[in-house]
Regions:
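Structural motif corresponding to alpha-helix initiation and N-cap regions
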Residues: 21, 76-80, 137
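A metal-dependent, Asp-based hydrolase signature
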Residues: 34-65
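Substrate-recognition element of Asp-dependent hydrolases with the DxDx(T/V) motif
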Residues: 61-110
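Active-site neighborhood of HAD-like aspartate-dependent phosphohydrolases
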Residues: 1-29, 53-54, 169-170
Length: 197
């Protein structure tokens, strides 16, 4: 799922006139109340109430939801095809720093792309449900334990170097995907290397 932090910030400013957006969302998008929402420490209603208290008069909970949805761009068609192909050969799991406001939007984007989350992924691990954020070792260790395979039989891919470093520190093999590069080539090379070992 591709993200657009700046569009999300713009939506918070335009729809809500919310002045603290730069304090809670950045390239890692997990600070302050946003981080608490994604870690499951704040409910969606609590988050919306806090945001609305700092927004223009007349702003609504739906305005908050709409502004939040602007962080999500969608899934590139080649990535959709890649996920379909990989799911035929491997068990796929999603590890996502996510929240109960954005999840319905992102799940809808997967559905529209023809790859519903429950069909393409064996299981999804969402930070707000796990009460832990990537790159915390707690997050990765819980995932490893729940999947039940030796960690060396797994491969974690992320577009955040911090998340990759956190996974490696927790004993999970991981590779960094630089947004805008060819994910398919990176994955195929990594999987080929694993088969040789």
């Amino acid at each position: 799922m591709d993200l657009d932090i700046e569009d999300c910030k713009r939506a918070f400013r335009q729809k809500l006139d919310y002045g603290q957006i730069d304090e809670i969302i950045d390239a890692c998008h997990q600070r302050g109340i946003y981080g608490e929402l994604e870690e499951g420490l704040l409910s969606a209603d609590e988050f919306r109430s806090i945001v609305l208290a700092g927004s223009r008069p007349g702003a609504t909970a739906e305005d908050v939801n709409e502004a939040m949805s602007h962080i999500l761009v969608g899934i590139e068609p080649y990535k959709v095809q890649l996920l379909k192909e990989l799911s035929q050969e491997y068990d796929l799991y999603m590890l996502s720093n996510n929240n109960p406001i954005c999840l319905p939007y992102s799940a809808g984007m997967f559905e529209q792309a023809g790859i519903p989350l429950e069909k393409i992924f064996r299981k999804c691990f969402f930070s707000y449900q796990m009460k832990a954020l990537k790159p915390s070792p707690v997050f990765y260790k819980a995932v490893i334990n729940e999947i039940g395979l030796p960690s060396e039989e797994m491969l974690f891919i992320d577009d955040s170097r911090k998340n990759v470093d956190g996974a490696i520190a927790a004993g999970l093999p991981a590779i960094y995907y630089e947004p805008g590069t060819d994910l398919a080539a990176l994955l195929h090379a990594a999987l080929k290397k694993e088969e040789v070992c």
